From Swiss-Prot:
It catalyses: (2R,3S)-3-isopropylmalate = (2S)-2-isopropylmalate. One of its GO terms (cellular component) is 3-isopropylmalate dehydratase complex. The gene is leuD. Belongs to the LeuD family. LeuD type 1 subfamily. Gene3D superfamilies: Aconitase, domain 4 (3.20.19.10). SUPFAM superfamilies: LeuD/IlvD-like (SSF52016). This is 3-isopropylmalate dehydratase small subunit. Heterodimer of LeuC and LeuD. One of its GO terms (biological process) is L-leucine biosynthetic process. Catalyzes the isomerization between 2-isopropylmalate and 3-isopropylmalate, via the formation of 2-isopropylmaleate. One of its GO terms (molecular function) is 3-isopropylmalate dehydratase activity. Its EC number is 4.2.1.33. Keywords: Amino-acid biosynthesis, Branched-chain amino acid biosynthesis, Leucine biosynthesis, Lyase.
């Protein structure tokens, strides 16, 4: 997973609350078996409207989504995070996230920055008054900056560490290789053991 320290990109003001995962990516797109190529599925229903924010310049090239409260509710869909990332988003700012979406985001390297509602309102105004304004998400200092607005955001320490170091679940597990080896070495012989990975050929 790619490390995340800070990112600056065009902010996209999405004035919508309770955006669920079916709105982020409709269920019809979940039949695909790959983990990439979902950019066309992101907000597919809403993008039928030519006036939808992502259909207008300069927001179509945005990389920081600024949404309303309760973003990512509904069913657990890693596809929702994949679609956001495939489109080009590196971070989502919201006053509150669904727990499952926040967890899926952390595992895929998408920063879910929880910012107070009043600060989100101020960021929206900056982006709407000056389209093309950039937003900086600084994971080191846990702050977001947009025009004259600088605001702190909440993110738990473990998620922050994993994002900063680029650690997915497998990488975290491999970080305990010595302990795993010691545990396996002490297991009684009659119990199942982990076999070495097979190689082709």
């Amino acid at each position: 997973m790619e490390k995340f320290t800070t990112h600056t990109g065009v902010g996209v003001p999405l004035r919508a609350s309770n955006v669920d995962t079916d709105q982020i990516i409709p269920a019809v797109y979940l039949k695909r078996i790959s983990r990439t190529g979902f950019e066309d599925a992101l907000f597919a229903g809403w993008r039928q409207d030519p006036d939808f924010i992502l259909n207008t310049e300069p927001f179509s090239g945005g990389t920081v989504l600024v949404a309303g409260s309760d973003f990512g509710t509904g069913s657990s869909r890693e596809h929702a995070v994949w679609a956001l990332k495939d489109y080009g988003f590196r971070a989502v700012i919201s006053p509150r996230f669904a727990d499952i979406f926040r967890g899926n985001s952390a595992k895929q390297g998408l920063v879910a920055a929880q910012v107070e509602q009043e600060d989100v309102e101020r960021i929206w105004k900056e982006l709407e008054n000056r389209p093309g304004t950039t937003v900086t998400v600084d994971l080191v200092t846990r702050t977001v900056e947009c025009g004259d607005v600088t605001a702190p955001f909440q993110i738990d320490d473990d998620t922050r560490r994993r994002l900063l170091e680029g650690l997915d679940d497998i990488a975290v597990t491999l970080g305990h290789q010595a302990e795993i080896d010691a545990y396996e070495a002490d297991r009684p012989a009659y119990k199942p053991t982990t076999l070495p990975a097979r190689t082709a050929g």
